[in-house]
Amino acid sequence: MKHVICPVCGNICIKYGKNKSVSQRWLCKKCKSINTPKIDNLTKQLNIFLKWLFSKDIQKDMPGGGRTFRRKTSKFWDIWTLPPVVEEKHSVVFVDGIYLCRNACVLICCDRNHVLGWYLCRYEHANAWISLMSRITEPALVVSDGGKGFNKALRKVWPHAKHQRCLFHVFSQVRRYTTTRPKTLAGAELYALAKRLLHLETRSEADKWVDEFLDWMRKHNKFLSQRSLDENGNWRATHESLLKAQRSLSRLVKEGTLFTYLDEDLIAEIGKVPSTNNQIEGGINARLRALLRNHRGLSVERRIKAVFWWCYVHSPRPLSVSELLKVMPTDKSIAAIYQKISELDKRTLYIPTWGDAVVWGELHKSSEFQNYWD
């Protein structure tokens, strides 16, 4: 049985009759204070809401045919669950973005156990990554799929963190350019090299792979330099897709982000280093897509909030329901802030200040002759 704790001294209370509204009173045996604790239904309602959100249940099967459920849980759709500031240093973090529609992307950062941060943007760019990463302490290693603007943000926010590009994304990018059945010798050899990239386990194997890639570039340099006329009469590279694959691999080899997971000093510091982004792709993004698929038909705003709720529940130390309702912003509070800013802009726009008012002499001319019709 759950005990009632005294709010004054923290000791266990005993039953002490009932008040006029027939609510149970409780007496503390130590400090003799009497209190009537209120039943907190918000926690129960939030648990019901989250249980529905994270399951395959539909609202029609909820009590009251869904109407009672929607009425009791509508308040939770108004909340924007924002990420906390992470001051604890982590050895490895994973970052990625998930697109919810054409102009809505949620950037997510996690470690092996929890979601550390999330940020809503229209598309992946440097400022969005900076906003996400600036709330998290710099880790020893970050694994990413090479999203747009991430390298710039990494240099600015986490300048000392080492970067490992997800090898599976690198392989997938090459496969997209060469296809799984290349029709040229150069394409077949490059595709075979890309497949081997996923199975390198030592530094010597990685160095050998780089040498073979450089040999491939020298061997097919003349073939890749071929140019031809397109339908508009312009000269273009004949094997443009192969050139894109070659340039992407060359850039990664030059940056030194392909084989960070084989760095012996880093392994000695943090242990085994991951080479792929599977932790966030399979552990978080896949579950978020399943959530949105189970509740398909949600508006874009509710899709975003559903992702925010999932990330918040899986964050390291989520707040209690009472604290969450007090701290987290809502649609109403955000609208009030924008309205206040809008009213301030209107006030400064329409109230004349020094140098803004109309000067009478600029619109009227004075002379020695009398002018009675002005």
Task: State where each predicted segment sits.
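A broadly conserved sequence feature marking short terminus-proximal activation segments
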Residues: 1-5
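Short, cysteine/histidine-rich loop/knuckle motifs that typically chelate Zn2+
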Residues: 7-8, 30
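Short functional micro-motifs and their immediate structural scaffolds
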Residues: 13-14, 36
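Short linker/helix segments within small regulatory modules
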Residues: 15-25
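RNase H-like nuclease fold core
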Residues: 23, 27, 33-34, 64-160
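Acidic/histidine-rich catalytic cores and adjacent linkers
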Residues: 25, 30-32, 36-48, 141-147, ...
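Short, charged amphipathic recognition helices of the HTH superfamily
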Residues: 52-63
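Conserved beta-strand -> loop -> alpha-helix junction used to position metal-binding or nucleic-acid-contacting
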Residues: 145-148, 152-194
